[in-house]
Amino acid sequence: RGDLPKAHNGTEKAKVKLLLSHDPSHWEAQVRREFPDVDVTFSGHTHGAQFGVEIPGFRWSPVQYFYKQWAGLYQQGKQYLYVNRGLGFLGYPGRVGISPEITVVELSRA
């Protein structure tokens, strides 16, 4: 189990704080409340439930009934969460309507 206070210790002088946290529900449960200086959290875990519908302007998956943030970019105030649907699977060895993904994040100085 992770220890966010321990991981966060010593980051006071960092201009930008990026966090990798497997489960996106961790963002609302702890990161946003206790660590408002974390700029971006990167998560996965949901796999988009490996099933859903995704067309321009509409995205649905049954995973949204279990995870408020389940795929893509979310923002609350100055904090961001990005949830990647990943490449793998759990249980059924495939995907229907939810493509696997690899995200490339390019960081640059403002």
Q: Which role fits each region the language model picked out?
A:
Residues 1-110:
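Soluble catalytic domains of enzymes that build or remodel membrane lipids, polysaccharides, and related
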